[in-house]
Amino acid sequence: MSFIRIARSLARGYYNLPTNIIDRTSINTSRKDDDSDTKATGSQLDSPDEEWLKDYNSFVNVRRRNRSVLRTFVFGIGLFLIIAILTLWWPLTGADLPQCHSIYMYPSYARVDGFNEKFTSLANKYHLYLYREQGMDKEPLNNGEIQLDGIPVLFIPGNAGSYRQVRSIAAACSELYFKQSDILINKNAKNLDFFAADFNEDFTAFHGGTMLDQAEYLNDAIRYILSLYDQPDVSTTLAKPKSVIIVAHSMGGIVARLMPTLKNHIHGSVHSYLTLSSPHAAAPITFDGDVLQLYKRTNEYWKRELNDKSSFIFNNVSLISITGGIQDTILPADYAMIEDLIPYSNGFTVHTNTIQDVWTPIDHLAIVWCKQLREIISRYLVETSNIYLPSKVVPLEERMKIASQLFLSGFEDSYRNYSGEELRNLTTNSEVSSEMKLNDIVKITKDTIPDKPYLSVPVAQFDGNVFLTLFSNSDNIKILGCANSYRHDPTIHSCKDLSHFIKKVPRYFDPNKEHKTESNKLLHTSIDEFKKYDFVIVDFSTIVEEHDLLVYATLSREEHTVIDVTPSNLLFMSQKIKVPPGALMNKWEFINLWDSLFAYKMNVDTTAMEQPFEPFVKQHIKEPFETKWHLNVLESTTSISFHNIAPFIPTNENITRSLFLTLVGSPENDYFIRISVDYLMTLKLLYIRYRLAIASFPIAVITMVLAYQFYIYDRRGIFLPFVTALGHLISTYNTIICFSLLGLSFLCDMKLVQNALFAIDPSHLNKPYFNSNKDVRNNFYLLGLRSKLLGVLVYFFFTIGTALVILLNGILLTFQKLFTMAINLKRTNMLQNQRTNTTAIITKWRFLALFLIIISVSTFIPYQMAFMLAVIIQVINSLKVSSLSARTKNHQNLLNFNMSLLLLLIFIAIIDFPIIIVFLHNVAIRCGTSFRSQHNCLAIIPILLMVNNNSLLRLPNRTKGNKGRLVSLLGLIYLSLFSLIYGIRNLFWLHHGVNIFSMWVFYLTIFSKGS
């Protein structure tokens, strides 16, 4: 029976039911009307006010409201758990599976002790290392002196990253130059001297001051590195380097772009940037306003420089941004985009799925060591080096050409127009050459190798919509562009090798095997690409007879079909496509499938009993460069996801945003394709993009409920329990809330509304259009949605936020109830007596402690640390009120008020906690970092005054007249709307909003006379 009584007691505590909680000796009857002042003290034990008790019960004792809360809780927590389970345990398949190979190296690191306080003020906090691959690179030190003989490269680690992450790429560069130099095309290449910054695993993403420190240190480091090559003992007589190559991971890429904006930057000291999983497009977290300010400053600087055709950056600097795609669960791959900022003449974004011989997504940490990718990166770094130039890299145009050749799939429009190498004179006649006609299909196997080794395509006979398509599993096929150079003999041609148009594509692989390393060859090129030639010749002369040899060649008009289907069409029914025989490649453009929040599933079937080769599907979008190769499509359902138009990412509205799918299959067979929405994958993708909503939406819910609590309190003198007030709002206004959120989603996607929201944004950091380019726009508001169909997500996340608040409130009330039950009932009046006798002493010591905290914030600790102290004080306040309520049952209003405030402060503490991590990290390594903006006393004094005042067991006075009530109501509603509309991209400002609210509460408690 005792267990049942405890359970019943806990349940009453959770729902704040009136039964046996409020008796007639616990009601303050000093009020003579509904607008009387409310002030709870330990000595108020008068007889009850019958009308007040009736009003209280009319709000609290409504089971329907409790059922509404329970339904909302179950629905919200259910959604939250589904997304969490899918994120953590739902497996990725097919092209989204990681396929990185293992690696090994023999690293050594030499700390550059010469880079000390004489060269940088941050030498005590950060350090510089020189990497050497054992057995290949020079020994790092000789008699204590650094030995340098290559081209300087600086590696910048990311958030909490280590300088040791340089080893994989640096080792690959050394191995390429010293052991595989015969494959290098660039004869002016040189080995690379890799330097790496040691930031003591600083949390760069959390703190703008840390970003500034790192950028300042790196500028000093570059100055020092370049000075090392000016020393006479450096073994080179060539041009001294005037710049370094930068390779950066994660937030290191943002620090690298920040460097040129600082005063200590050496003009022209960096020509080449290569970033790995760096969030260029948007800050991954928004807990610190300084980070957002630095993003804005950096982007404006780069945009201004790139708009100036005479600037150094426009004419010399390249930036390649590589992202791991869907496997990166730390940073949304959308955030790595630079297309809105940097023109294609200076850089581009590419997904690792796209890169030839990589063809795999890569997670956030593996991107610095994945074997396939590091081999391509090392090739790029070495091939773009030039020992004879002071910049130590080839000119910008050549650098971008090499980047396109190495990092793109080869099927992009920007890849075209590279001239082939002069080959030889070639003699063709009817005995050795056959002419290919429109709609011809040529098939070659080991049993049908043609007697005529040349297949000729007369270019002049066809228009630009005719495509030459070639599929082969052989490496011994060439494409030649030939012209009739000898008028006396039309069978003799001058030819160039155009085999670079033939690209690798991943071969069908067994998912049970560890690796897939083999590739097929694919050519799909418009005849327009060959207009300067008379003939295009497919050369089979060197083909080798193999048991699985297969070659298909077709000449046909491109099968490009535009499909006008929307995600809403695919929600409940699938799009079916029939592919008749006759074409080697069939291409579809889905002009309305552009939203990255949707994922789709595709099934491919065929009536053919046998397949000459396994058909596969190429999926791609035009910006950024993202190509996926879906293999094994006949065996299983294929998941389709992409990174196109995404929340909070700038988008050029003049660029085609269609999703393209291309089926490569036997022209002898027919195929059937079915596409529909993949609900589970769509839910899985929500987490990575909306993690910050877990912090902002609950605050919107809490402040909305607080507004209602204050409204009822001002009118009737009842400060409702939090769950009771929430239940009343849900049961009464749920439909209004739902449609209001949907309407808000539609409004926030309108350009006029976005401009208005930016005008009234107190932070003024997120401009909906990018500088003067009105075609590049962004939606920073609410969930950043561009699709009206997904407006329902706002209500879903609001429900999840509500459920999380209910959960935390239940946990707090449970602990409060357990604490109350644990109190010794014999000491009923001890606390009241102690408070009566020592009030003056406690107040004196509290204000002394408050003064010391303010001094500490001004000089040493960030205000976020003081806020954590305020949260602890509020916890104590709530427990103290709980203990008094448990004995005298006369502080229900005071308990409800303190518990609601505690809920709000706990969620704000989640936002402030990362800055505290940075501060404690710096204390642990005994290094100081500037916390300039965090030493703002005004950002914490009102909160400290409020919680200190709460510790004296005071309630705010009920406001006099409508004006005071309006201030409380509108202030909290504004804070709730701000949390919804601006919160995700301005989490740092929510602290300041609560700080202003705290000042108002303090004013109501101390200075307001009430009514």
From Swiss-Prot:
GO annotation, biological process: endoplasmic reticulum to Golgi vesicle-mediated transport; ERAD pathway; GPI anchor metabolic process; protein retention in ER lumen; protein transport; protein-lipid complex remodeling; vesicle organization
GO cellular component: endoplasmic reticulum membrane
Active-site residues, as the UniProt record annotates them: S250
Signal peptide: none
Uppermost EC category: hydrolase
Start and end residues of each stretch annotated as Disordered: 28-47
InterPro entries: AB_hydrolase_fold (IPR029058), PGAP1-ab_dom-like (IPR012908), PGAP1/BST1 (IPR039529), PGAP1_TMD (IPR056824)
Domain of life: Eukaryota
Transmembrane segments: 72-92, 692-712, 717-737, 740-760, 792-812, 847-867, 900-920, 964-984, 987-1007
EC number(s) reported in the record: 3.1.-.-
Glycosylated residues (UniProt): N28, N66, N316, N417, N425, N654, N837, N898, N949, N957
Topology versus the membrane: Multi-pass membrane protein
Keywords for the protein's UniProt record, in alphabetical order: Endoplasmic reticulum, Glycoprotein, Hydrolase, Membrane, Protein transport, Transmembrane, Transmembrane helix, Transport
Record's subcellular location: Endoplasmic reticulum membrane
GO molecular function, one term: phosphatidylinositol deacylase activity
PANTHER family: GPI INOSITOL-DEACYLASE, NEGATIVE REGULATOR OF VESICLE FORMATION-RELATED
Reported function: Involved in inositol deacylation of GPI-anchored proteins which plays important roles in the quality control and ER-associated degradation of GPI-anchored proteins.
Family listed: Belongs to the GPI inositol-deacylase family.
Protein name as catalogued: GPI inositol-deacylase
Species of the source: Candida glabrata (strain ATCC 2001 / BCRC 20586 / JCM 3761 / NBRC 0622 / NRRL Y-65 / CBS 138) (Yeast)
